Amino acid sequence: MSEKNIKGIKFGILSPDEIRKMSVTAIITPDVYDEDGTPIEGSVMDPRLGVIEPGQKCPTCGNTLGNCPGHFGHIELVRPVIHVGFVKHVYEFLKATCRRCGRVKISEDEIEKYSRIYNAIKKRWPSAARRLTEYVKKTAMKAQVCPHCGEKQFKIKLEKPYNFYEERKEGVAKLTPSDIRERLEKVPESDVEILGYDPTTSRPEWMILTVLPVPPITIRPSIMIESGIRAEDDLTHKLVDIVRINERLKESIDAGAPQLIIEDLWDLLQYHVATYFDNEIPGLPPSKHRSGRPLRTLAQRLKGKEGRFRGNLSGKRVDFSSRTVISPDPNISIDEVGVPEIIARTLTVPERITPWNIEKLRQFVINGPDKWPGANYVIRPDGRRIDLRYVKDRKELASTLAPGYVVERHLTDGDVVLFNRQPSLHRISMMAHRVRVLKGLTFRLNLLVCPPYNADFDGDEMNLHVPQSEEAIAEAKEIMLVHKNIITPRYGGPIIGAAQDYISGAYLLTVKTTLLTKEEAQQILGVADVKIDLGEPAILAPREYYTGKQVVSAFLPKDFNFHGQANVSSGPRLCKNEDCPHDSYVVIKNGILLEGVFDKKAIGNQQPESILHWLIKEYSDEYGKWLMDNLFRVFIRFVELQGFTMRLEDVSLGDDVKKEIYNEIDRAKVEVDNLIQKYKNGELEPIPGRTLEESLENYILDTLDKLRSTAGDIASKYLDPFNFAYVMARTGARGSVLNITQMAAMLGQQSVRGERIKRGYMTRTLPHFKPYDISPEARGFIYSSFRTGLKPTELFFHAAGGREGLVDTAVRTSQSGYMQRRLINALSDLRAEYDGTVRSLYGEVIQVAYGDDGVFPMYSAHGKTVDVNRIFERVVGWKT
């Protein structure tokens, strides 16, 4: 057999002759089985169409089930029918060609000119050739008289899905598929080509079917259901319908039945052939099973998420995988995954026996499939597979093991596996972890690794895949392990880092008021898997105390320097240099934390140019992993010992504070009333480019926004800096000052589509307000807080604002998913070459430099090639 290189694939339309040639039999009978249950010859289950039973031989090719590819049959249609997939093309042909002579409705000179141009450009510039054919079609469709035979043209109408009508002088006439085929047969090959079709593979009359191909049985096998009844495939049901109606139509024509009956049967045949190709045609009732379920026909097999392309080619089901709920575990390493023992006993890794591992593997074989760590199978050098469930004496089998055997052993601690959470929106939605077999039934995941997976623990499930070859394991270790992906390729910052309790703990530990006795320091350092020397206590008398800053400094490299603002540096605690009384400017010199606190800006996830980022960048991702596995555990331990909780009193304000807020509310109400009065009196000054109504809305919104922020500032001013709700908001651990404002002071304006709520009843939002009322309360402003509780009208407006968020999320998800899929398909063949260019599969240059600057964000300094300031600081320090 000679080898050939595939240059390309060309799609065309099957001609009636080709359909007959590739067919092994004509399908003529609607009955499928005889009384004995044997398939009838000439039926849609004719044995010559392929083998679906094990052990049988195909009468056509002589092969058995595994090797018989299946063979086509054909149905000779009594009357032609339109192929529903080509209706648009048929419509174009009918409008662009003459009804009498079949020529394209442009002059001979133009045909010659356009043909010459088309043939010159079609190979080199296919898109230009397509534009030319579109122009020819549009020009030809406009012609009212044929330039070749002088015939006057009538208007053609398409009534979807497949009925064509011609508006003649005497009235509207329906064009039957026979009429259409007759017209299309007249179109010469040169004219077919100028309309953008290849006449050798796609003649227009082939779009009107006279012969229907019957697919092999192998793609529509019948299945035996529990009761022993044979259930046929949906395609088989559809083909039986087509054969039955075709036979009835033939009998009616032969018997000389009235034209009305023949036309009804012809329409029915057209319907069955159309729904055979696509059972979701708009305007056509779907063909249904006896149970009422719509049949899954050819188009449904191909399109959509479960279809052939996305369901079986782009994505496949795999072996050696498992799925269960995930639970948090801060005590395992960031690149470990806790695997339930039941899963570890089910999933296996093939390990080849060598002189160095033979004793270990013998013990695994003796343990067998039910005791972990054991083994499920042994594969002998001759390829024979031994299932250990059925081996009586496993010790004897273990003694016969020798180098060359392969043992499919259970997952054990340290094995490399792939972990994934759907939807997999970016590369690091799938990373490699090392196995830690644990009790329980859920996968355990370190909390720090949630952001790349976008995981939380409210019932999320994740998938685990076990690589089966040494190459796959090596690749996973080298490029997919979690700590090698701490820096995200999206923006060159750490996507894995502290969140929530970690940040709260870090802040409480590093704040300057935190002092620890030696015993307390030892207790929190006990969770770190490393020896720590704290040095001399910071306070010696009246009692020895270590500061929280000393504890953190013990984990930092001795040559590390950093300075920058903390997250708490805002509002009254804002500091822009080292002279900071509020502990909100971070200074680290020679690995010692001298000033400032650790919060979100220092160690938080998705925080580029943070302390964590520079530590990983300058001291390796291995060091980053070590830091997260040790120092971050200390933060959690500290917050556990310290206690960290929130109570109702944390968001309760005193009477004097409430009075201050109510005064602000009254002032804002007066201001809004004045604006409305000015508007009614015609004294309001419009904003340039806005109508008077829009200007009023803007002025009111500005006033109400100021009111909410003022109320928030008043509440914040009176909150204790160690109020835990406030600590969470200021450090960036969870929530924001706005959330506290809404809980303690007021909710503020509820908006829908960025505007105050307007819609509701005819002249008002709710029946609780007067018609044409545009006051803040009537348009969705909520003066209450969550602490005091919402009034009924306020609750309604709040629900309207919340509903918009839900709808928006659902719409955005589907749109972004579809957009991403299109981008992936378009960009999947591009790659960055060694010369720095980005090229397509054919070597075409897409970008002269990758990303126009040749910088890969993952290895950059937050997208910059080099951070010069940081390098200077490392070499010469910074000016104080």
UniProtKB/Swiss-Prot annotation:
Enzyme Commission number(s) of this protein: 2.7.7.6
Signal peptide from the UniProt entry: none
Annotated Zn(2+) 2 binding sites: 98, 101, 146, 149
A single GO BP: DNA-templated transcription
Keywords noted in UniProt: Cytoplasm, DNA-binding, DNA-directed RNA polymerase, Magnesium, Metal-binding, Nucleotidyltransferase, Transcription, Transferase, Zinc
Annotated Pfam families: RNA_pol_Rpb1_1, RNA_pol_Rpb1_2, RNA_pol_Rpb1_3, RNA_pol_Rpb1_4, RNA_pol_Rpb1_5
Stated name of the protein: DNA-directed RNA polymerase subunit Rpo1N
Naturally occurring in which organism (per UniProt): Saccharolobus shibatae (strain ATCC 51178 / DSM 5389 / JCM 8931 / NBRC 15437 / B12)
